[in-house]
């Protein structure tokens, strides 16, 4: 065996390096593939007049707005009737046009909202003026509270009738925990001058609890090719409106509850209410990127335990350009729900949206500070917000369609918008935060203490607690805002790539039940700028196996941190394997990457005749040569000495096993976090 080192100097190289990703949703055989929903055309430069001229000449019609700097949708003109063969002939001719860089048919992909049907069954829409007004008039000094919201610092509690049921704002979780949002509000932050867009099935822009905060510049209808994101009134398109209400429901209007960032501007993209193709996703992710600060998505591929799927080349390009040029170069912030496939033993590592370097992946916890039954585990999760587990537990309060309210929003669908709202508070505090700054401060301020009674907590080689279910802990709005106020932009990011190749050109055969280790020695890219402080770690792996779900991949860092990149998935009987799938871990954040990295490939197969081939793997290290600033409210290295807790600088890779250690650690970390927040 030998290893070969290459260095990637710019992010674009990384983008190009994963263009060969295969997805389970991609098909090429016409007899089994869905009909293309539309075709895209990319010109060498954006030119609306030329695009319409080309389309007209070939009996086509441009739909909607261009995206990605010169890419257009078009369909066969409504007055034309063309056979499949005739459509292909048109595309063939257009491929030879000198002004066209790309012409491609777009086929729909399966995308699912990450909520549950039971939430609709128990939903209690508090529609109205009758109950809501009656409740508001019973509140002492209600008008004084309403008036106070117009000032920088509100007087709590809010008069909104369902505010007291927003337990995740009001110390309502077991042990008196919440997401410390009131602390941010009382500092005067409510999301002013921050724009959030919900990428979903649309939002009801005239909802009385959203209308005052509605942002048309953060909204569009890609499914209907117009500017109105209003969802169809068919009972099945309430998801986006609910998510929008979590972020920016108006406070003090005696209707429903309040949004996390109740002064933020909220928009929506109607893109899930129709065929969802790569170009539909790309257009959504790149909408008005210099105006929109945060894109929130509570959907993804099938959470069925047998699918590998993620963004196509256009959507990956949209992510890349978003972080490079969005928000005037500071980078768009993409917040993503981690997935609801836990009951099917799915892993969010098989979801290419949550495993993107460019997304901030968010998990869920319940009111009793446990992991819900639907939760997926993976090492790309950064942090957690509250949601619910079943119909007997309080869920998330938000707006509903038509013009109503609900107490029953749930799933990781509910967690991502709460995170987006908390991030909006931090952006109001510091508009100069880059997309990487935001990942740093979310990770550093996430609070593990409420969730420590769950198994799986580990201290990484940089001394930080993490859990594959919850990331680095529960998001803490007060701590996030305080750290944002004093945060200095992180040093420039560098990327080093190490490729593992076999001694022989043929893939290595693997059979039955086995365990194999493949190691790479990392030196920190001495030939150029070194990576000495890790952020993201990606593994691009290629293999085939008789039953893909029998494989387990674990990555070990030089500091002893183990990340389960892919757990066994019993439902996954696919025999095609994966090709350069980008597994992502944030669990080694802050570590020094120099030393021996090992990828352990295991099989849980009981069938000796089940085999396959291991082809190659690459290790991509994202990080900096210099450390980010030292402010770290949750870093266990600041803990007082304790005989019951090992040093965070030891290579601790096992679970914190004993309840005595857990209790002691909780008490000490609580003291640390309280003091650290005050000092900020």
Please name every model-derived segment.
Residues 200, 351-428, 432, 468:
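Extracellular S/T/G-rich loop segment that most often corresponds to the catalytic His/Ser-adjacent loop
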Residues 2, 11-26:
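N-terminal signal peptide
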Residues 600-609:
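Short beta-strand-plus-loop segments that form exposed binding edges in beta-rich domains
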Residues 173, 181-183, 194, 201-206, ...:
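Subtilisin-like peptidase catalytic core
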Residues 38, 64-84, 107, 111-113:
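Surface-exposed aromatic
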Residues 430-466:
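An often Trp-containing, charged/polar helix-loop segment at the C-terminal end
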Residues 339, 466-468, 473-551, 613-680:
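Secreted peptidase-domain scaffold signal
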């Amino acid at each position: 065996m030998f290893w070969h080192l290459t260095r990637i100097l710019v992010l674009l190289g990384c983008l190009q390096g994963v263009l060969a990703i295969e997805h389970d949703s991609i098909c090429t055989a016409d007899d089994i593939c869905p009909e293309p929903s539309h075709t895209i055309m990319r010109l060498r430069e954006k030119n609306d007049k030329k695009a319409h001229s080309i389309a007209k000449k070939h009996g086509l019609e441009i739909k909607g707005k261009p995206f990605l700097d010169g890419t257009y949708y078009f369909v066969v003109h409504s007055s034309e009737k063309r056979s499949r063969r005739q459509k292909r002939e048109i595309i063939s001719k257009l491929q030879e046009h000198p002004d066209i860089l790309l012409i491609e048919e777009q086929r729909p992909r399966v995308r699912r909202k990450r909520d549950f049907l039971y939430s609709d069954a128990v939903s209690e829409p508090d529609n109205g003026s009758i109950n809501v007004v009656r409740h508001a008039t019973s509140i002492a000094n209600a008008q004084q509270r309403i008036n106070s919201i117009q000032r920088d610092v509100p007087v709590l509690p809010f008069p909104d009738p369902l505010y007291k049921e927003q337990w995740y704002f009001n110390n309502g979780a077991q042990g008196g925990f919440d997401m410390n949002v009131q602390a941010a509000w009382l500092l005067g932050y409510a999301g002013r001058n921050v724009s959030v867009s919900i990428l979903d099935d649309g939002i009801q822009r005239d909802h009385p609890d959203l209308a005052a905060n509605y942002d048309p510049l953060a909204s569009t209808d890609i499914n209907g090719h117009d500017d109105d994101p209003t969802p169809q009134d068919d009972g099945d398109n309430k998801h986006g409106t609910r998510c929008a209400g979590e972020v920016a429901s108006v406070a003090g209007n005696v209707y429903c509850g309040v949004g996390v960032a109740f002064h933020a501007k909220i928009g929506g993209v109607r893109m899930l209410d129709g065929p969802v193709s790569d170009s539909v996703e790309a257009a959504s992710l790149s909408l008005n990127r210099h105006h929109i600060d945060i894109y929130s998505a509570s959907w993804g591929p099938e959470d069925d335990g047998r699918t590998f799927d993620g963004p196509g080349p256009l959507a990956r390009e949209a992510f890349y350009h978003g972080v490079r040029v969005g928000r005037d170069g500071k980078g768009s912030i993409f917040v993503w729900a981690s997935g609801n496939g836990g009951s099917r033993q799915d892993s969010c590592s098989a979801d290419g949206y949550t495993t993107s370097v460019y997304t901030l992946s968010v998990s869920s916890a319940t009111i009793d500070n446990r992991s819900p039954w639907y939760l997926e585990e993976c090492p790309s999760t950064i942090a957690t917000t509250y949601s619910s587990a079943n119909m007997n537990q309080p869920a998330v309060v938000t707006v509903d369609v038509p013009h109503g309210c609900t107490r029953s929003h749930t799933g990781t669908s509910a967690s991502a918008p709460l995170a987006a709202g908390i991030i909006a508070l931090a952006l109001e505090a510091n508009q100069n935060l880059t997309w990487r700054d935001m990942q740093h401060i979310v990770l550093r301020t996430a609070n593990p203490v409420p969730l420590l009674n769950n198994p799986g907590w580990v201290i990484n080689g940089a001394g930080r607690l993490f859990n594959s279910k919850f990331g680095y802990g529960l998001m803490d709005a007060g701590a996030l805002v305080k750290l944002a106020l004093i945060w200095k932009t992180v040093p420039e990011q560098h990327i080093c790539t190490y490729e593992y190749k076999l001694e022989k050109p043929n893939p290595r055969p693997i059979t039955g039940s086995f365990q194999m280790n493949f190691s790479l020695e990392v030196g920190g890219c001495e030939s150029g700028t070194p990576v000495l402080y890790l952020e993201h770690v990606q593994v691009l792996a290629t293999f085939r196996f008789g039953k893909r779900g029998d494989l387990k991949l674990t990555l070990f860092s030089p500091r002893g941190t183990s990340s389960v990149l892919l757990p066994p998935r019993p439902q996954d009987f696919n025999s095609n394997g994966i090709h350069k799938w980008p597994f992502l871990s944030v669990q080694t954040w802050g570590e020094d990457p120099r030393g021996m990295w090992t990828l352990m490939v295991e099989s849980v197969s009981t069938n000796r005749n089940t085999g396959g081939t291991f082809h190659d793997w690459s290790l991509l290290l994202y990080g900096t040569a210099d450390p980010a600033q030292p402010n770290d409210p949750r870093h266990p290295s600041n803990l007082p000495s304790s005989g019951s807790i090992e040093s965070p600088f030891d290579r601790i890779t096992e679970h914190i096993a004993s309840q005595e250690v857990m209790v002691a650690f909780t008490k000490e970390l609580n003291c640390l976090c309280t003091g650290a927040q005050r000092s900020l």
